[in-house]
């Protein structure tokens, strides 16, 4: 049979004020693209006519400008989870306009199944192809796995965007598998990075499908900034640390799978590892595969890669599709509850590497908020990996804003990963190995190896004035560097004596 075809505007007109919408995708890749471009226009028109119009948006991870950015600018988002990297969304959230839950990405599907977000009125998913059965639709996903099997099963209605920008052979990259809910859950049978345990397609109750929007729209993912001397040095520091750990016997000689977060720093780490002849051929078990991974897969430095999203440039995506016979044997796209599963991460011994906004001298880490209050992005999947990884590494530049902000501080203004979950901190200055060390030894390691030289005397001074205890802190001066930045615009102007009067 053939399902009803709709224009994007017709599809947007079927969405109601206060609807909760679940979306495919994970990062900008794999998200529906046509319907939301019309929905944001509709929201503006509704508001201009004096009528309310807002929706809740539930996804696997971040999405795109045409979803989060334009909808936030149209004041059309009532609730959002679990993650965002969009500037417009961030601005409106920090103005208090959007109710945003920053949540571990690996938890999203099961929280939906447990009903924590209420009913899903509509699921909108992107496919490269589909089999239009009378009772069951087999939907072949594009460049991301996300939370699709869960949202199409739970949603009252399903809208499909068939995007012919993607090759129909994208199906050969997917391993679609939904975890059973407690108390009927069984072990996830992934024993190796490349294991396939599910199907190439998501199954949808055909009676729920209200229509199909056909389009040909490229992905919105962009290339990251080119590496500079600072990010390159951080990458080399991570690579040197891992090689040293392998020589010490802490890492097996065959190496272990790597997870790396998203962004320029993560690419720098992968570049350094890929180029270093002392690092064996390795595998990647992560949530997002970027261009660097594809490059080193082609060169034979990366054997297998598993992810929830192929977040690469459109040129690289085309390369993957054009060489699908190779990549279908070495690259797997999973649901985020499998890519980010604590069970699988621990079983495989994944080495976790993610980016921090700031770390304090005792090893606590902040991924999400500036000076405690202002949302930057969110935790994403970092904690899924860092809490369960074989080794948990955070990287950050030692300073930002031309040296006015130190990423190493006495106390984090917001904590996402605690000192109990952080094994290693890396900046361009060096590496602090926190394993097997108490608070004071950790503090000295971080100050001397990771802090910028401009800030080391200040941080040493803080240790002297902090009240004695297992983990010395001064409640009056712990956030003095942040307070000074807010008042004077430069943490280097901090005078602890002003806070001890």
Locations of the language-model features?
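Conserved alpha/beta enzyme-core scaffold
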Residues: 1-501
